[in-house]
């Protein structure tokens, strides 16, 4: 291991208008994903697996569900007397559309960076799904002698950076004077003054920045060739543990090529779907190519295709709803059948 050489920084200040149907009541990193996880679980687990023992999360808005999910960081072994998981919301009142940038929020909590003893910092967003070994990125960073290492896949930045903690503090100090708001802008504007090295990541990666990408990359994980690249035995993805009984399959239910979490009651037909915990599918109901989140209740004789149902949705008997692969139909959190019919 790398003996706690790295500090983890997760930038949760991003707002994506194209994900507003899924972020109306939560922050980006708290979006449920892959049947039992939240988006932030992937980057946080990557950091912990690289022996990063101090992780700072900088949320901007609607972060109650994120705080509830992360707690004190026990599931990630970050509930520590020294170092651990830190949560740094903005002390300023603002609207979620305000684009003040992450560096302003970093600067509001500079004492955290001053107290940190780690030599290097890993800075990432909360909405990139991958299973990357940061210890190898750091090794390359040290061998080449870079000021900044930026992680790419197929020529596209994954918005993941490694640099010295000293350099990060310098960039935070200078952000107002030099006119950059985020780490991405800082790297671009300082490219002539700093040695910036690309690191090509060859594993599975998905940047979730729209409903279409959320749907596409979620459905990819039904396929073993994708699932096996993300969920590695030697690099586990951790999440908040919730105890549920095994899923109950009714006498006339059929389930094909689907991911099904615990606690469900399935009495209908499910094909190419992802079902989160405690979902109920009524008799005679058919689901195809759907993502059904926690505690959704679907009545009898419904027909749903290419639908994303957020948490706690209630769908009445004989309801039909469909989207497309490019525009899946999103049923917002807490929606009930009457509201759906009138919308």
Curated annotation (Swiss-Prot):
InterPro entries: ADP-Glc_PPase, GlgDAde_trans, GlmU/GlgC-like_hexapep, NTP_transferase_dom, Nucleotide-diphossugar_trans, Trimer_LpxA-like_sf. One of its GO terms (molecular function) is glucose-1-phosphate adenylyltransferase activity. It comes from the Bacteria. The keyword Lyase does not apply. The keyword Membrane does not apply. Keywords: Glycogen biosynthesis. GO terms for biological process: glycogen biosynthetic process. SUPFAM superfamilies: Nucleotide-diphospho-sugar transferases, Trimeric LpxA-like enzymes. Induction: Expressed exclusively on media containing carbon sources that allow efficient sporulation. Belongs to the bacterial/plant glucose-1-phosphate adenylyltransferase family. Required for the synthesis of glycogen. This is Glycogen biosynthesis protein GlgD. The lineage of its organism: Bacteria, Bacillati, Bacillota, Bacilli, Bacillales.
């Amino acid at each position: 291991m790398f003996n706690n050489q790295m500090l983890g920084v997760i930038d949760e200040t991003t707002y994506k208008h194209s994900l507003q149907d899924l972020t109306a009541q939560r922050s980006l990193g708290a979006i449920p994903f892959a049947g039992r996880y939240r988006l932030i679980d992937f980057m946080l687990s990557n950091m912990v697996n690289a022996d990063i023992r101090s992780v700072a999360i900088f949320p901007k808005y609607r972060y109650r569900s994120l705080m509830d999910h992360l707690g004190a960081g026990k599931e990630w072994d970050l509930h520590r007397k020294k170092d651990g998981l830190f949560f740094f919301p903005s002390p300023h009142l603002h609207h979620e559309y305000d684009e003040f940038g992450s560096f302003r929020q970093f600067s509001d909590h500079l004492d955290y960076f001053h107290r940190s003893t780690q030599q290097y910092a890993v800075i990432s967003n909360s909405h990139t799904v991958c299973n990357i070994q940061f210890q190898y990125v750091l090794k390359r960073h040290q061998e080449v002698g870079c000021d900044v290492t930026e992680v790419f896949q197929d020529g596209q930045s994954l918005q993941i950076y490694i640099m010295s903690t000293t350099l990060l503090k310098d960039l935070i100090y200078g952000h107002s004077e030099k006119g950059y708001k985020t780490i991405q802008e800082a790297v671009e504007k300082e490219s002539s003054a700093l040695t910036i090295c690309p690191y090509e990541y060859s594993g599975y990666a998905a940047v979730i920045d729209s409903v279409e990408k959320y749907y596409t990359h979620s459905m990819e994980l039904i396929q073993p060739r994708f699932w096996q690249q993300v969920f590695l035995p030697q690099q586990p993805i951790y999440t908040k543990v919730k105890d549920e009984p095994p899923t109950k399959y009714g006498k006339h239910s059929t389930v094909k090529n689907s991911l099904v979490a615990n606690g469900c009651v399935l009495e209908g037909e499910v094909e190419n779907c992802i079902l989160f915990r405690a979902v109920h599918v009524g008799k005679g109901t058919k689901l195809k190519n759907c993502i059904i989140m926690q505690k959704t209740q679907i009545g009898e004789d419904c027909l749903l295709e290419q639908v994303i149902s957020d948490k706690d949705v209630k769908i009445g008997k004989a309801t039909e709803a469909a989207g497309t692969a490019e525009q899946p139909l999103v049923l917002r959190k807490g929606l009930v059948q009457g509201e759906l019919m009138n919308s």
